[in-house]
């Protein structure tokens, strides 16, 4: 790539990044999660260039899942790049490979939060893009998620321990991060597992999204991401409305039937979802929520089928309670 093209690419992405800079206040301490793939390399290069003018204090975190032979070479490449750019590098290697994508995600975020807290860094920054957000909306839609799930993968959220997770590239597509890396000759690490179609997200990325782009909407990524934005805003509104009723709804871990029944159906479902997620220690599915709502007019001592961990919901006079089966 010629220098002028690199300059144009740089200017374009920095302009696209500008709306997200409010998430990265001047003087912030950032732990940047860098796998070595194109999205995280693009993010790191943009932040390295922005750091002097914004007073950003950067550290890089890299996790080796040990899912494939040669994964240690990715860590070595990222470490070399960090040394060239003068960014402290932190590495974590899995003792045993995570058993699933969900387990790997939980492990990553737990470690990133711990490192950020240990270094007194306020934010963990990841390279999730607009393309990731579009794929997440589609993935959750196919799973039957409600508005909260479809509006997930937000720009910022609490990670824990006072650390916040920030995704400043959610307005930039994967094609753009690839072009940026090419223009700046960044050494992209290729993860062969991203081509494994046994992973449903890979099948969405490699088969379903290209089909939708060709046959339905050439801007399908932008359309789905915008839908996620709209649903997230509506979900936040519903959550704030639910907060206004929460203290009258829940007392001593039980749910008040008449107060719940007086709410609109959308708030009823959200109330039950929030209540069950605390009691069960996991997110309930639609059938669990429907079973609880079916108890609103049921006789005293009516019980649902077991929901999770042998727990079920029982009608206790004016209240609904979680009990062991």
From Swiss-Prot:
<keyword id="KW-0963">Cytoplasm</keyword>
<protein>
    <recommendedName>
        <fullName>tRNA(Ile)-lysidine synthase</fullName>
        <ecNumber>6.3.4.19</ecNumber>
    </recommendedName>
</protein>
<dbReference type="GO" id="GO:0005737">
    <property type="term" value="C:cytoplasm"/>
</dbReference>
<dbReference type="InterPro" id="IPR012795">
    <property type="entry name" value="tRNA_Ile_lys_synt_N"/>
</dbReference>
<dbReference type="InterPro" id="IPR014729">
    <property type="entry name" value="Rossmann-like_a/b/a_fold"/>
</dbReference>
<comment type="similarity">
    <text>Belongs to the tRNA(Ile)-lysidine synthase family.</text>
</comment>
<dbReference type="InterPro" id="IPR011063">
    <property type="entry name" value="TilS/TtcA_N"/>
</dbReference>
<dbReference type="Pfam" id="PF01171">
    <property type="entry name" value="ATP_bind_3"/>
</dbReference>
<dbReference type="GO" id="GO:0032267">
    <property type="term" value="F:tRNA(Ile)-lysidine synthase activity"/>
</dbReference>
<dbReference type="InterPro" id="IPR012094">
    <property type="entry name" value="tRNA_Ile_lys_synt"/>
</dbReference>
<comment type="function">
    <text>Ligates lysine onto the cytidine present at position 34 of the AUA codon-specific tRNA(Ile) that contains the anticodon CAU, in an ATP-dependent manner. Cytidine is converted to lysidine, thus changing the amino acid specificity of the tRNA from methionine to isoleucine.</text>
</comment>
<dbReference type="GO" id="GO:0005524">
    <property type="term" value="F:ATP binding"/>
</dbReference>
<keyword id="KW-0436">Ligase</keyword>
<keyword id="KW-0547">Nucleotide-binding</keyword>
<feature type="binding site">
    <location>
        <begin position="35"/>
        <end position="40"/>
    </location>
    <ligand>
        <name>ATP</name>
    </ligand>
</feature>
<dbReference type="GO" id="GO:0006400">
    <property type="term" value="P:tRNA modification"/>
</dbReference>
<dbReference type="Pfam" id="PF09179">
    <property type="entry name" value="TilS"/>
</dbReference>
<dbReference type="InterPro" id="IPR015262">
    <property type="entry name" value="tRNA_Ile_lys_synt_subst-bd"/>
</dbReference>
<keyword id="KW-0067">ATP-binding</keyword>
<keyword id="KW-0819">tRNA processing</keyword>
């Amino acid at each position: 790539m010629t220098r002028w093209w690199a300059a144009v690419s740089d200017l374009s992405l920095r302009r696209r990044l500008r709306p997200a800079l409010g998430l990265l206040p001047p003087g912030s301490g950032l732990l940047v999660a860098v796998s070595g793939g194109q999205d995280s390399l693009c993010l790191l290069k943009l932040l390295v260039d922005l750091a002097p003018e914004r007073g950003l204090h950067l550290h890089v975190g890299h996790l080796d899942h040990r899912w494939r032979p040669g994964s240690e070479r990715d860590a070595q490449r990222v470490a070399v790049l960090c040394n060239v750019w003068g960014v402290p590098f932190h590495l974590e290697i899995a003792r045993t490979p995570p058993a699933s994508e969900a387990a790997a995600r939980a492990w990553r975020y737990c470690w990133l939060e711990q490192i950020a807290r240990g270094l007194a860094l306020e934010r963990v920054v990841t390279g999730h893009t607009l393309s990731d957000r579009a794929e997440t909306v589609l993935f959750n839609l196919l799973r039957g998620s409600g508005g909260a799930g479809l509006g997930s993968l937000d720009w910022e959220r609490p990670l824990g321990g006072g650390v916040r997770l920030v995704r400043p590239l959610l307005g930039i597509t994967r094609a753009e991060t690839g072009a940026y890396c090419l223009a700046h000759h960044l050494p992209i690490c290729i993860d062969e597992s991203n081509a494994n179609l046994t992973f449903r997200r890979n099948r969405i990325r490699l088969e379903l999204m290209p089909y939708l782009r060709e046959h339905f909407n050439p801007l399908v990524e932008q359309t789905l991401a915008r839908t996620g934005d709209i649903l997230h805003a509506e979900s936040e509104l519903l959550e704030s409305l639910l907060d206004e009723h929460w203290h009258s709804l829940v007392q001593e871990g039980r749910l008040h039937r008449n107060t719940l029944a007086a709410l609109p159906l959308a708030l009823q479902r959200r109330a039950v979802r929030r209540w069950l997620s605390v009691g069960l220690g996991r997110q309930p599915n639609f059938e669990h929520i429907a079973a609880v709502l079916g108890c609103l007019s049921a006789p005293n001592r009516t019980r649902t089928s077991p929901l999770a961990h042998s727990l079920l919901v029982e009608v206790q006079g004016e209240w609904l309670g979680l009990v062991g089966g």
